[in-house]
Regions:
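Domain-core and long-helix interface of multi-subunit machines
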Residues: 1-103, 172-186, 198, 203
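C-terminal functional module detector
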Residues: 80-88, 93-277
Length: 278
């Protein structure tokens, strides 16, 4: 249950973040679940109802359980931003041992280093998520960096020209800057001219920087323009969380019996597909 904690934290006047949701969704094993309406609806309504829930982890520890969480984040951005708020990206060690410190972390942009400045930056999204580790759902392009992740030294938004330009710290390796809209990489490079990608844009754009040290993620830039077509929250799936039959289904869904059945079904599917290919 991811809803109870944000509700109580907001009631008490605090801020919350949803951690490693892929653990609960089990999307690290079944990445397609990051695109299921039932989970998009569930988490979207948490962010809609509790604005003190600032965002979600897109990286946790070595990224094993969160490898599919960027996909869910992108799905949520498409339906939550049109409702009047953003979802900030977080990355955390989840460290239980000293040697786990420094695996995934945030880089805050602060006028001074104190508690109030950190809280304000968290609330406003003035920080980057970063990690030494990059895992993918298909295993392609995975790597472990040395921790010296790419750093952003400047971001310039030209509203007249519709461009965004990012400057990277020359002392940190940055092999590529990828620009992502609706979950897809649509451009690479330090500058994106949004006019060149009008047919591929939705309500946001974000970038990620990859280098030998790891990956650094920006927060989403909301795009406001005439003719923007927004995706609705797939509220048809709310019955699962608001009715007794739905609650029984979710209890069964998170049971070992269901997990075992899903695993067997997946093995059968792979076996059949391999036979067809041969």
């Amino acid at each position: 249950d991811y809803r109870t904690a944000p509700a109580k934290v907001e009631e008490m006047g605090g801020y919350s973040v949803l951690n490693h949701v892929g653990d609960w969704v089990n999307s690290n094993r079944y990445p397609e679940r990051s695109h299921w309406d039932v989970f998009i609806t569930y988490f979207a309504n948490i962010f809609k109802d509790y604005h003190t829930c600032l965002g979600m982890e897109i990286k946790n520890n070595t990224d094993n359980v969160t490898r599919a969480d960027r996909a869910l984040w992108d799905e949520l951005l498409q339906v939550v931003i049109p409702k009047g708020r953003n979802i900030w990206a977080f990355a955390d060690d989840d460290s239980e041992k000293l040697n786990e410190v420094g695996r995934s972390f945030e880089l805050f942009v602060l006028p001074e280093n104190n508690e109030n400045a950190v809280k304000k930056a968290m609330k406003d999204g003035n920080f980057f998520a970063a990690s030494r580790y990059h895992k993918t759902t298909d295993g392609i392009g995975e790597f472990e960096g040395d921790g010296n992740v790419p750093l952003v030294t400047d971001i310039r938004v030209n509203k007249k020209e519709n461009t965004i330009t990012v400057a990277a710290d020359p002392d940190r390796d940055c092999e590529v800057i990828e620009w992502i809209a609706d979950g897809k990489v649509i451009a690479t490079g330090n500058t994106i001219d949004l006019n060149d990608y009008e047919d591929e844009l939705g309500c946001y754009i974000r970038f990620q920087m990859k280098g030998s040290g790891g990956v650094t993620y920006s927060q989403p830039f909301e795009l406001r323009y005439s003719g923007r077509v927004d995706k609705p929250v797939p509220d048809w799936a709310l019955w699962i969380f608001r009715t007794e039959p739905g609650q029984k289904f979710m209890k069964f869904y998170h049971s070992r019996t269901f997990a075992l059945g899903a695993l067997v079904a997946e093995k059968i599917r792979i076996f059949i597909e391999d036979k067809i290919k041969k």
